[in-house]
Amino acid sequence: MIDFLSGLQHRVVQAAADKQAFDILVLDLRERSDLTDYFVICSGNSRMQVQAIADSILDRVYESHYTLSSVEGYTSGSWIVLDLIDVVVHIFQKDVRRDWLQDRKSTRLNSSH
């Protein structure tokens, strides 16, 4: 999966995989957004695992001298967002991700009417 990635997004995906993140998804937003180039979305089973995934990614970011703009949601550990400027990482507990996807689907259905 990570063979086609380079640079920061590759490091993020590898760091997440190192902590057994699952359902890892990389979205290329370069043609769709002026705010970031990629979203990396992944899941963990518990608050502790989600925080461990975030810690692993942050360690890799610091080692590689990339810029961290902000971290949101770390304390609660249900949905952590790491803004690395060119890559925004969303790390969900699996139930929170499922609910988030349901909300997005509902919003799309309601906005199409």
Regions found by a protein language model. Name each.
Residues 48-66, 81:
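Compact, glycine-rich, soluble single-domain proteins
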Residues 13, 17, 21, 58, ...:
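Signal for well-folded cores of large energy- and translation-related assemblies
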Residues 1-5:
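N-terminal presequence-like segments and adjacent domain-start helices
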Residues 107-111:
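Conserved small/polar residues in nucleotide/adenosyl-binding loops
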Residues 6-38, 45-47:
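N-terminal first-folded block
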Residues 23, 27-33, 69-86:
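Glycine/charge-rich, flexible interdomain linkers and switch-proximal surface loops
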Residues 39-41, 81:
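Short aromatic/hydrophobic contact patches that present stacked aromatics
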Residues 81, 85-105:
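C-terminal structural segments of small proteins and small subunits
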